Amino acid sequence: MATQTELGAVVSLWRYPVKSMMGEELNAAEVTTRGLRGDRAYALVDGKDGKVATAKNPRKWPQLFDFRANFIDHARSGAQAAPIRITLPDGTMVTSEQEDCSQILSRALAREVMLDAVGRGDEETPSSAFPARAANAEEYWPDMEGLDFRDTVTDFALPVGTFFDCAVVHLLTTATLDRLGELYPRGRFEVRRFRPNIVVQPASGGTGFIENSWVGHTLAIGDEVRLSVTGPCGRCVMTTLPQGDLPRDPDILRTAAQHNHVQVGVYAAVVRGGTIRRGDSVRRAA
C-alpha cells in the first residue's frame, strides 16, 4: 500500500437538495461519480426564459436563501426524483409530490417557476428537462476589485445533465475559514456562506489556505472514497448574501479577492465512490 499523508478529518457533511436553497447537514453520505447522493438533485427553472434559478443572480432571485429543502426519506435520497420537502420563508411546507408544488413556489417567489429534477438512481442517469444539453443560468458580478467582471450579469452553462455550477464535490477546510477571519475579524466566515459538501479539520499544525496545495492530488476519505482535487473554488456574490442570522457583507468576498485570488475551498471529481462519515480521516493518497 502506498504511503498516505494524513491531512485531517471530516467535521461536517452537507448537501443541498435544491440548487441555491438552504440544505441539510448529514452524519454520513453516499458518494457516487455524481457527488453526494441527492446533492443538487432539484432546481427551479424560470418559466419565462428557461434558465435555472440561482442565488448567483440575487437581483433576479433575492429570496432563494429564505427557502430550505430536505429529503423526506433519507433512505430514498439516492432514488430518481426522491421526494423532498421545501420550507417556505413563512414556514409553509410543500413537497415535490404535490401536484401544485410549482404553483406554490411560483406564488412565494412572485415569479413563474417549475421544480425540475435530475435523476440519481443506481444507473446515475439524468432525468430532467436537460438530459442531453447544458442548462443555462445567470451570475451577477458586483462592482469589486479582483473579479473577472464588474457590475454586470453574465450567462454560464451548467455541466451537462446536472444542476452543479462546476464540479460535483466541494471541499473546504476550517483553516481557510480561520485565516479569512484573521484577515477580516468583523466578518462571519461560517460554513453556511460557502456551501461546501465536505468540511475538513486539518491535522495539528495545518493553517492558512491549505487546501490550495491539494489541487492535482488524490484524497482518500475513510475506507472507501477517493477524490481527485481538480482546482480551486472561485467565489461569487452568494457568499455576501444574508441568510438566517448572517448579515449581508460584501467584505466577505472582498477579503477572498484581496488575499486568495477570489478562491475559497477546492473542487473535486470522484475517483471511487463509497460512504463517508463525520470523523473520517482525510489523507493525501497521490
Tell me the role of every PLM-derived stretch.
Residues 1-286:
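Metal-cofactor-dependent catalytic cores
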